[in-house]
Amino acid sequence: MEENEQNNREVEPQQESGEESNRGILHQAPPGNHQPHHRITNFFIDNILRPEFGRRKERINHQDELFTGRDTGALSGAESGHHRVNVPEGAGGSSKVITVTGEKKSDLAMEETLKSRGLNGDHSLSSDSDSSQASSKATQKPILWPAWVYCTRYSDRPSSGPRSRKPKKKSVSKEDKRPRTAFTAEQLQRLKAEFQTNRYLTEQRRQSLAQELGLNESQIKIWFQNKRAKIKKSTGNKNSLALHLMAQGLYNHATTSKDGKSDSE
């Protein structure tokens, strides 16, 4: 009987030590709901064409595993409300212990890990910032239309129709007018005698008369036209040819004067 009691006493401390060891293991084990932070990758053409596009993810995953392994001891103190985070400061192997409470643990841990990652973290952040800046610049910059849009006829004022240019009136100066011909007495006497014989000159007769009087053909032609107009205006009678054509109904150039009387009256 005494031996059985001794055996029972020896078993009880062994069970107590086993329970204590199990509790220690449970405290050391990381909680099951802890999940590593996954970063969203922006698949822009600029990011894909960079040489460090595929390598960056592998380095981040490897450093995340190292970071979670070092922080198992710090995460075991979640029940007390105070947590210690071991963060590597540089390549020398020295570490820095930070004591945080409550919900600030995850934010500070992420900031310190990004600082410890050095170029990798900075590069990832810079790539994201570059993409966001490019998108913001694209939205802020106004749309640039091609030049031919502004050169078309109806682009700037579609409701006004085609453009019409009004011709500018040329200011007639006195110098542009043709000076009047000053005929001599002999020239006037010869022109009047020629007009008495024939009121209409042929081309050959006009050329010979211009050579004799030393005038241009146009000057002689204009003098004859003016002479016929003066006679017609003074008499008001139509010539025989006009009367013959009017009788046949082939000629009727009657005009109305300011007084309301026509030439035929």
Swiss-Prot record:
UniProt region (Disordered), positions on chain: 1-38, 60-138, 156-182
Molecular function as annotated in GO: DNA-binding transcription factor activity, RNA polymerase II-specific; RNA polymerase II cis-regulatory region sequence-specific DNA binding
Chain's gene name: en2-b
Protein species of origin: Xenopus laevis (African clawed frog)
CDD domains on file: homeodomain (cd00086)
Top-level lineage group: Eukaryota
DNA-binding region: 176-235
Low complexity bias spans: 122-136
Keywords: Developmental protein, DNA-binding, Homeobox, Nucleus
Presence of the UniProt keyword Metal-binding in the record: no
Alphabetized Pfam families for the sequence: Engrail_1_C_sig (PF10525), Homeodomain (PF00046)
Entry's Gene Ontology BP terms: neuron differentiation; regulation of transcription by RNA polymerase II
The keyword Repeat is assigned to this record: no
Main localization (coarse): nucleus
Residue ranges, compositional bias (Basic and acidic residues): 1-12, 102-115
Name recorded for this polypeptide: Homeobox protein engrailed-2-B
Location(s), subcellular: Nucleus
GO cellular component annotations of the record: nucleus
Family, similarity comment: Belongs to the engrailed homeobox family.
